[in-house]
């Protein structure tokens, strides 16, 4: 059995780490490189960086900080933000990233997933899915351009359909960003995770809602996700990664202990 992964998420805007609630009202957390090093030192399995306004602004993630992060950490990291071409991805990988993640650009051009997977291998290609539960319809829908409140829109895709589509096109991993739960710290949406797990054959990463160590345990034990991504509980030092891993190991979760 592969070890479960603990993955801090760093949302980046204008060279700094930000954090919002339900993808709104972002506050500044701090500088990118010191936070990345802190999480690596605490025992994170990997890091994810989202340049949250790159896609909506029509630009590619700023690559200067990618190189600086690669210099100070020795764990894998994934970068996302406005990647629309093989050339965009190649440059980010050449600066030291281990994976690239695409979200809104994949919705605009689903063939991008296949082209990137064919060029770099599926193990390198992550697809992020921003999913919102609509109380009126009782369905989960995929959103696009969520880094900009003024441009966020609901797409025609229901979440489960898009999960299956991106796998067919070559996604090697899926990060499910559950927008309703984002930043509120009352637990992952286990109902949605279980539904996605049933149709997801590639590694599945839960994102949105972690507030306690028990929430991580529930995601691993009840929804069988491969990794759990979180931001505010780590940024605000509510949970220490080393202590979290010790707790999970004590509960029987296969986890890498530093």
From Swiss-Prot:
**What is the top-level taxon of the source organism?**
Bacteria
Instruction: Tell me the InterPro entries matching this sequence.
Output: Aldolase_TIM (IPR013785), His_biosynth (IPR006062), HisF (IPR004651), IGPS_HisA/HisF (IPR050064), RibuloseP-bd_barrel (IPR011060)
Keyword annotations of the record: Amino-acid biosynthesis, Cytoplasm, Histidine biosynthesis, Lyase
Report the active site residues. Answer: 11, 130
Regions that span the bilayer: none
Q: Per the record, a Pfam family? A: His_biosynth
Where does this one sit in the cell? Cytoplasm
One GO molecular function term of this record is: imidazoleglycerol-phosphate synthase activity
For the biological process aspect of GO, one term held by this record is:
L-histidine biosynthetic process
Pathway(s) per entry? Amino-acid biosynthesis; L-histidine biosynthesis; L-histidine from 5-phospho-alpha-D-ribose 1-diphosphate: step 5/9
Report the sequence similarity comment from the record. Answer: Belongs to the HisA/HisF family.
Role: IGPS catalyzes the conversion of PRFAR and glutamine to IGP, AICAR and glutamate. The HisF subunit catalyzes the cyclization activity that produces IGP and AICAR from PRFAR using the ammonia provided by the HisH subunit.
Full protein name: Imidazole glycerol phosphate synthase subunit HisF
Name its species: Salmonella choleraesuis (strain SC-B67)
Its lineage opens with: Bacteria, Pseudomonadati, Pseudomonadota, Gammaproteobacteria, Enterobacterales
Its gene? hisF
